[in-house]
Amino acid sequence: MRRVLAAGLGVSVAVLATSLLAWLGWAWYQSRLPETYSVMDFAIPDQGGAPPGAGHTHGAARATSVVDLRGPRGTPQRRFWLTAANGTVRLASGRTVHALSFNGTVPGPELRVREGELVEVTLRNTDVAGGVTVHWHGVDLPNGEDGVAGVTQDAVPPGGSHVYRFRAGQVGTFWYHAHQASATEVRRGLYGALVIEPAIVPDARVADMVVAVHTLDGTPLVNATDGVERRAVQPGTAVRLRLINTDNAPQRVDIGGTPFRVVAIDGTDLTGPTLLRRRTLELAAGGRYDVAFTMPPTPVKLAVENTLVGLALSADGNSDPSTPAPGPEFDPAVYGRPSPKPFDASSHYDRVFSLDIGRKLGFFDGHPGKQWTLNGGIYPRVPMFMVERGDLVRISIRNGTGAVHPMHLHGHHMLVLSRNGVPVSGSRWWSDTLNVEAGERYDVAFRADNPGIWMDHCHNLRHAADGLTMHIAYAGVTTPFETGGAAHNHPE
């Protein structure tokens, strides 16, 4: 009897093991991405509560290709040329680093334009083997100019070029970076600052400077300096620091020696910013804060992550004051003066979506492990939020993981309505790159007024490359571009 039971148990175990192996093999096979594919192929359309059939339809008579959603023609007021290349760059310390660069520098050249100007940028690829594009981070431009390989264009191969054109319609601090193999190419140096100034600059006497934070080859940088960048600013001068986090992780910035105001977030001005003293500013990966103050008679020090890397301002440009101690964290949800909002929690929304960020065991492109999920799905079987032009859209973002996720929506700015169920009580807070901490929930809203197929992804670009990527698609918009090895397009 025992032998019979043992034999039966052995058969059952063998059957279970065979079934498990068969299931694992099937799951592995199903997870593998095709050699080439369209971002429209595998995503799960989510209509956000709108009637069925309101979403994207392939081949419909009203279909519009992303190649037709381009910037204005005509004579540009500003022309720039960006040349991407492999090479070495010399840091302020004298150390040389092998990097990718635009125009031979890391960061690439600072581009400054005026509101209303037609801007033309010609990208040339000298020898970046994997190809390159330029994405204009935070600029709500036409979809065909967005610079995402495999969605809005093909990556530019070595020896090739591509022209971007857009009207500078927003005033504020933005940046540009590669969106082909971005987890690698941005980290290795393909990025730079873009500043859109008012059509009429109110006061040319302002000391207006970019402070771009990055980690290059393991070395923290402020602009091109791997130490303290020193600048001369005379007492009494109005100062505006444009803080840009081009890194993959949040960056904590402390300013000592003066009170200051946070006057803009992600390129949008705040209402009624008040003076802050000893406040730590945490910048989302990809995010921007504009800080303003009047230069005091004594030096001012900006420190990144409480390290020796930073910016020192003084009358003679030679001082290096002590590193400021961290203070309480700045909270944009309660900062500034409340002001009328175009929509709020009580508004009628045409589309209402939930975006739940999670992790689970599974396969991603044939690789086993603990994978990022969006609404329970592993890329590419993740939601695609479908909208119509003119829709008022609301999204609830929940982070159920133990990591922070700076969620970046291309082509739009989101109005932050609430955090963890508590309404924003300060200034209107518009964001294109929202830092969603572990366990947090944000409710955001935007008007769907910019047709296209737009990425919505984590701007920890390593997370995005590992599948934390989805898209928002307007009904009737199509793309002829494909992603994958044969297409040579790899947006993340």
Language-model features and meaning:
Residues 145, 154-157, 204, 210-334, ...:
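Histidine- and aromatic-rich segments of cupredoxin/plastocyanin-like copper-binding domains
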Residues 85, 179, 213-215, 244-246, ...:
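Active-site-proximal beta-strand/loop segments in catalytic clefts of secreted hydrolases
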Residues 78, 117-121, 237-241, 391-393:
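Structural beta-strand segments of beta-rich domains
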Residues 182, 231, 347:
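Catalytic cores of large soluble enzymes that bind and process phosphate-bearing ligands
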